[in-house]
């Protein structure tokens, strides 16, 4: 794919327009876009300074953000302008000299790359990545979580861009293929999962927890807390917001909003509800995904704006 022509002849396309066009073509998309002049970053909507500048010649590194002043400090990670951020190779070989580590993120499966400070899964495949994710990404199974685990009553917001889901020999097509948000991540076996775009067009809120009477490191089981039908369009940007708060009166409350509309709103009062702080993150299955503007901050647990829930929303 060739990069989109610059509007007006000399003006470079915005990074959002360029990445949108690039992600929309699978294997060659971003490779083609990289042949173009690097676009200037768009001014962020909140008026703050844009993210990291071009990566140094010896490889990309994340811009150093000030250490948070304390628990529940807002989380606004800054990605490098280009290149690999971290991957499952670094997770499984933390002491390897060629492992790429991130101060903010852990990837337990797949690869996290950056393009003009956007996060990107790369083109998903079913093979394990090497130290630089040069030949394979492994991102048909993409698991991204924060190093921080102090997110209690929290609202997570970001913009996401997803291509239609595919399949690999390792990962055949499943109804749940798509994009998911994690809240109160305690481990790979204990978390809240908010599915914002699944292959089957559903949005679903689940709690994952260790199987009763089984070892804690054994694959956990899911309990569905809420579900509705709300299929976001592929190949375009969408704003997602997930919140978790409580317990209050013995209940943990979780909501999912898409493009400003509440689509799931549920209370978890099961004895296995997750009441303590944890990490936040993103999960992808058989899906190429990009994201930007990822933030996590305090959430009071108040009712969302008076917008009608999606049809079939579980309260």
Model-derived segments and spans:
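Short carbohydrate-recognition loop motifs
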Residues: 100-142
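Short tryptophan-centered beta-strand motifs in secreted/extracellular beta-sheet-rich domains
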Residues: 156-158, 235-247, 252-256
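Flexible glycan-contacting loops in extracellular carbohydrate-active proteins
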Residues: 266-293
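Short, aromatic/His-centered strand-loop micro-motif at the edge of beta-sheets
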Residues: 213-239
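Extracellular carbohydrate-recognition regions
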Residues: 62-109, 116, 305-313
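Secretory/extracellular carbohydrate-interaction modules
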Residues: 129-213
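N-terminal export leaders
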Residues: 14-19
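N-terminal secretory signal peptides
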Residues: 1-13, 24-28
């Amino acid at each position: 794919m060739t990069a989109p022509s610059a509007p007006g002849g000399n003006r470079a396309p915005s990074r959002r327009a360029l990445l949108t066009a690039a992600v929309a073509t699978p294997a060659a998309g971003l490779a083609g876009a990289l042949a173009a002049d690097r676009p200037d970053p768009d001014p962020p909507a909140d008026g703050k300074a844009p993210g990291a500048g071009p990566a140094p010649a010896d490889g990309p590194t994340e811009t150093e953000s000030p250490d948070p002043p304390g628990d529940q400090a807002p989380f606004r990670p800054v990605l490098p302008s280009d290149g690999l951020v971290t991957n499952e190779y670094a997770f499984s070989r933390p002491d390897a000299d060629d492992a790429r580590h991130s101060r903010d993120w852990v990837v337990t499966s797949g690869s996290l790359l950056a393009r003009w400070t956007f996060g990107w899964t790369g083109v998903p495949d079913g093979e394990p990545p090497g130290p630089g994710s040069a030949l394979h990404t492994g991102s048909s199974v993409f698991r991204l979580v924060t190093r921080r685990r102090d997110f209690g009553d929290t609202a997570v917001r970001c913009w996401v861009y997803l291509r239609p889901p595919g399949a690999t020999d390792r990962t055949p097509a499943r109804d749940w293929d798509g994009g998911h948000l994690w809240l109160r991540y305690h481990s790979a076996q204990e978390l809240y999962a908010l599915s914002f775009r699944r292959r089957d067009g559903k949005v679903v809120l689940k709690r994952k927890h260790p199987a009763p009477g089984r070892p804690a490191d054994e694959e956990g089981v899911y309990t569905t807390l809420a579900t509705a039908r709300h299929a976001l369009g592929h190949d375009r940007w969408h704003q997602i917001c997930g919140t978790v708060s409580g317990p209050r009166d013995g209940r943990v409350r979780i909501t999912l909003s898409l493009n400003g509309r509440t689509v799931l709103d549920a209370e978890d009062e099961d004895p296995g509800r997750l009441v303590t702080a944890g990490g936040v993150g993103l999960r992808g299955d058989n899906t190429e995904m990009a994201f930007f503007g990822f933030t996590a901050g305090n959430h009071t647990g108040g009712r969302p704006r008076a917008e009608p829930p999606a049809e079939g929303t579980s309260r």
